[in-house]
Regions:
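Short alpha-helical DNA-recognition segment
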Residues: 22-46
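DNA major-groove recognition helix of helix-turn-helix/homeodomain DNA-binding modules
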Residues: 51, 55-72
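Residue-level detection of the helix-turn-helix DNA-binding "recognition helix"
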Residues: 19, 33-34, 49-51, 60, ...
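Helix-turn-helix DNA-binding elements, focusing on the entry/boundary residues of the two helices
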Residues: 14, 25, 41, 56-59
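A short, Lys/Arg-rich alpha-helix, primarily the initiator
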Residues: 1-21
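Short, charged recognition helix plus adjacent turn
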Residues: 2-4, 27, 64, 71-88
Length: 88
């Protein structure tokens, strides 16, 4: 399974989306588990704090739970630069 690297901004965006839906972490995780995700609340909490990695399938689940576009998750995250681009 593919993972997305942890990011503080990604975590903040996930938290913002959860709160805008009026959900607690427990409610969000319960909905993800109904969709087949084995994600625990403690792991979800780490993701929101930008200290944990998220599986792509869990991001897909969050998109369904929050009913938002994928762009909302990556809002305000600057594009990464490859090492080739940063070398003079």
């Amino acid at each position: 399974m593919s993972k997305l690297l942890g990011s503080e901004i990604l975590g903040e965006n996930i938290k913002r989306l959860r709160l805008s839906c009026g959900l607690t972490q427990e409610q969000t995780v319960a909905r993800l588990q109904i969709l087949g995700s084995p994600l625990s609340r403690s792991t979800y909490s780490l993701i929101e704090m930008g200290r944990g990695n998220i599986f792509v399938n869990d991001l897909v689940g969050l998109q369904r739970v929050f009913n938002v576009s994928y762009e909302e998750f990556f809002k305000d995250i600057p594009p990464s630069r490859s090492s080739k681009e940063s070398t003079p």
